[in-house]
Amino acid sequence: MKKIFVINPGATSTKVAYYENTTEIFSHEITYSLEQLKPFNNIFDQLSLRLTDIESLIKEKIPNHKFDAVVGRGGLLPPVDAGAILVDENLIDCLKNRPLLEHASNLGASLAKSVAEKFGVESAPSFIYDPVTVDQMNDVARISGSSLIDRKSVGHALNMRAVAHDVANKLNIPYESGNFIVVHVGGGSSASAHENGRMVDVISDDEVMFSSERTGGIPLKQYINLCYEKTKSEVTELTRKKGGLVSYFGTNDARKIHELMDNGDEKAELVLEAMAYQISKAIGELATVLKGQVNAIILTGGIARSNFISDKVRERVEFIAPLFIIPGEKEMQALASGALRVLNNEEKYNVFEK
């Protein structure tokens, strides 16, 4: 039995969990008010506060346990391969001093290493697993149509690869031998084609389908006009925070839109059907990447809780492959399962190179 501690830092919280193999024994969310975090100038200034709180929690709730590994949520690294990355000084230095963006997940590696050193068995490793910048895209998929812009692999890699592993197990085939299409839709959205264990193409949240808050891909000529009518920050906000459902209804809560639809609101029904329509188009696009050889299609994220959207997607895509619905996110389970595969020598970890 392997004892694994998981750390998932977010903007105003740190989620932690203790697993024995893949069984969750304990979980807790340490929350912070904006006032508590206000004195800190940057994310890494919060390290001591968050670490102290984690250590206190371990001493109180999980006494006398020595962890075989500690795994943290990834961070905004340059493009990396999928799977586990061993936490070392190079990795921490990049996340601290040269991250692509400031984000709480950049603390995951440092927190994991510190906890492993204090509460792990002798030489217990610490990892991050499947950060959002996992990049296994085929070179042909990077071509955008402009020599000034490359398509990027940015998406919900941790959850998408985790649910692909889960469905592969249900189908009794190795993930490394199957072909899967995974769509994650929540506040943002992304979709991916998995071919023989590699995520060979990714549709990011500025392409194709809209979500609760993002516009997705929108008509470019009209978008160019919008750029000249508003500032960069205004356009960014309109497309990334006030797009999607927020743009049409002023809320990112899909449940409220469903209530409107259930009460006869035709606009609500049309927009929700359009969301399912665009999700289906993304699936169709990725099916061509896999040349139609698809073992399963998976819809995940918050929107997968919608029976209306799930059913509408199913109507359009099940001629390609069976559709599996896996609502929500499985980040903590995914981190623990990834670390367990490394400890059991089912996967090898990667070493980050500057």
Place the predicted regions along the sequence by residue:
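Glycine-rich phosphate-binding/hydrolytic loop that grips phosphoryl groups
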Residues: 304-305, 311, 324-354
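Glycine-rich phosphate-binding loops at beta-strand->alpha-helix junctions
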Residues: 294-313
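Short beta-strand-loop/turn "lid" adjacent to the catalytic site in phosphate-handling enzymes
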Residues: 58, 62-104, 125, 133-145
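Short glycine-rich, Thr/Ser-proximal phosphate-binding strand/loop in the N-terminal lobe
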Residues: 4-45, 205, 209-210
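N-terminal phosphate-binding loop and adjacent alpha-helix
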Residues: 27-66, 91, 95-102
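Glycine-rich phosphate-binding loop plus the immediately following alpha-helix
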Residues: 107-110, 128, 143-179, 187-188, ...
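Phosphate/pyrophosphate-binding loops at sites that engage ATP/ADP/AMP, CoA/4′-phosphopantetheine
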Residues: 55-69, 169-173, 282-295
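Adenine-nucleotide phosphate-binding core of ATP-dependent small-molecule kinases
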Residues: 237-292
